[in-house]
């Protein structure tokens, strides 16, 4: 069956035909047959250079030989035990060694579960109920943060099914806005348990913090006894060996991880200072548990991945990122497109917006229809990126310089189509 037929069949049994909404792009998503290295292949016979990379986990590319071999070996001796394993200790040591804020770590099943658990832990540690997030930030599909609101006011649900009383415990302020954050904390800081933030906002495209903003956030949270949680589900092990906190030089109280920590398999983690982490059950009164937490297959994939990520690895990946971003900038300059390319490390995106993008409102001023033309044109040129202006694109170690050159050439064509100079 072809992708079009499979999508129709899928909609009979799976809501919307997909297991996550962003995958349901028009007119229908392509269905994958296999993937290897930097390439992904669909059932229709097409091959793509993949810059979606499962939305970030695959920093080594698809089906990395070492990961495949060692995970396959683990499968032969069991896929779940319901008991601790030595490999959990090995992976925990890797995390603690790499992440500056990590003195202890707890493994869970996803990034969303990690953020939910970290927020609960922050509330348990501080004895306070309210939390702060930034507009447009995504911290998983749970009730604590799937909310929206105006600065200084309690949030309202961002989806049906979340009680208003739950949303009222969350505040949301614009990213990169020191004044709005300061005003809120001055108003209600005594009741705020934590501030959770994506260091780089990777679920609204790719928005970096302004110079000095992270230092400001760290200082004001410390001064007001508010725990600072870095959501590094995307940036953890992506930007540097020690994540975005190493990359930018600011250390939080707690860190949440997902994606890369599981080496392409379902896995999340949250880590932090020992005095905070020891409040988690069974040591302390903050409950957290899961049948598949610390699953041996995911743990092995995490070990097999992290062991390959040394400092030279990140230098090479940054070089690739700079190469592609430089090529994109040259295309934009030569053609005079009034758009904004962004990115850092091995992350990149183009906002179809002439102005700099510093926050959620700026991002949503982008031309979504033009982006859609760009996305579809890239597919025709054999390059796959996430089908949304508000996701980030990624580079893996499996991407060759030839791949990146081809991607740049495809972007040049796709921009011509987007601006109706071609196609």
From Swiss-Prot:
Highest taxon in the source lineage: Archaea
Pfam families linked: Aminotran_3 (PF00202)
Modified residues (N6-(pyridoxal phosphate)lysine): 259
Keyword Isomerase recorded: yes
EC code: 5.4.3.8
Organism: Methanobrevibacter smithii (strain ATCC 35061 / DSM 861 / OCM 144 / PS)
InterPro entries: 4pyrrol_synth_GluAld_NH2Trfase, Aminotrans_3, Aminotrans_3_PPA_site, PyrdxlP-dep_Trfase, PyrdxlP-dep_Trfase_major, PyrdxlP-dep_Trfase_small
UniProt-annotated location(s): Cytoplasm
Annotated Gene Ontology cellular component terms: cytoplasm
First-tier enzyme category under EC: isomerase
Chief subcellular location: cytoplasm
GO biological process, one term: protoporphyrinogen IX biosynthetic process
Family: Belongs to the class-III pyridoxal-phosphate-dependent aminotransferase family. HemL subfamily.
Keywords on record: Cytoplasm, Isomerase, Porphyrin biosynthesis, Pyridoxal phosphate
Catalytic activity, reaction form: (S)-4-amino-5-oxopentanoate = 5-aminolevulinate
Required cofactor names: pyridoxal 5'-phosphate
Pathway assigned in UniProt: Porphyrin-containing compound metabolism; protoporphyrin-IX biosynthesis; 5-aminolevulinate from L-glutamyl-tRNA(Glu): step 2/2
Protein name: Glutamate-1-semialdehyde 2,1-aminomutase
GO molecular function: glutamate-1-semialdehyde 2,1-aminomutase activity; pyridoxal phosphate binding; transaminase activity
């Amino acid at each position: 069956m072809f992708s079009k037929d499979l999508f129709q069949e899928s909609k009979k049994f799976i809501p919307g035909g997909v297991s996550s909404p962003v995958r349901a792009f028009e007119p229908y998503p392509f269905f994958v047959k296999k993937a290897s290295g930097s390439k992904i292949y669909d059932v229709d016979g097409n091959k793509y250079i993949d810059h979606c990379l499962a939305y970030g986990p695959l920093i080594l590319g698809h089906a990395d030989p070492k990961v495949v071999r060692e995970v396959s070996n683990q499968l032969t001796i069991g896929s779940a035990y319901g008991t601790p394993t030595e490999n959990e200790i090995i992976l925990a040591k890797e995390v603690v060694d790499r992440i500056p804020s990590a003195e202890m770590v707890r493994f869970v099943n996803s990034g969303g579960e990690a953020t939910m658990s970290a927020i609960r832990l922050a509330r348990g540690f501080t004895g306070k109920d309210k939390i702060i997030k930034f507009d447009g930030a995504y911290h998983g599909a749970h009730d604590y943060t799937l909310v929206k609101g105006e600065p200084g006011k309690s949030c309202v649900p961002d989806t049906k099914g979340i009680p208003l009383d739950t949303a009222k415990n969350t505040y949301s302020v614009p990213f990169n806005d020191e004044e709005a954050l300061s005003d809120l904390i001055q108003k209600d800081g005594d009741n705020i348990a934590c501030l959770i933030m994506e260091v780089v906002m990777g679920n609204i495209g790719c928005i970096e913090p302004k110079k000095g903003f992270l230092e400001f956030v760290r200082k004001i949270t410390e001064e007001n006894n508010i725990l600072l949680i870095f959501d590094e589900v995307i940036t953890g092990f992506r930007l540097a060996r020690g994540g975005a906190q190493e990359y930018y030089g600011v250390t939080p109280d707690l860190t949440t991880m997902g994606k890369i920590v599981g080496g392409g398999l379902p896995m999340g983690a949250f880590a932090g200072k020992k005095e905070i982490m020891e409040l988690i059950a069974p040591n302390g009164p903050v409950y957290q548990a899961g049948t598949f937490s610390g699953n041996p297959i995911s743990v092995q994939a995490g070990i097999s991945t992290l062991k390959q990520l040394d400092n030279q690895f990140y230098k090479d990946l940054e070089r690739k990122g700079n190469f592609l971003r430089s090529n994109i900038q040259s295309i934009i300059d030569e053609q005079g497109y009034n758009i904004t390319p962004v990115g850092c490390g091995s992350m990149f995106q183009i906002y179809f917006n002439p102005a700099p993008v510093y926050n959620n409102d700026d991002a949503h001023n982008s031309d979504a229809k033009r982006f859609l033309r760009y996305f579809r044109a890239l597919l025709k040129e054999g390059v796959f990126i996430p089908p949304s202006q508000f996701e980030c694109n990624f580079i893996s170690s499996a991407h060759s310089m030839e791949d990146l050159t081809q991607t740049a050439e495809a972007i040049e064509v796709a921009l011509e189509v987007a601006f109706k100079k071609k196609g």
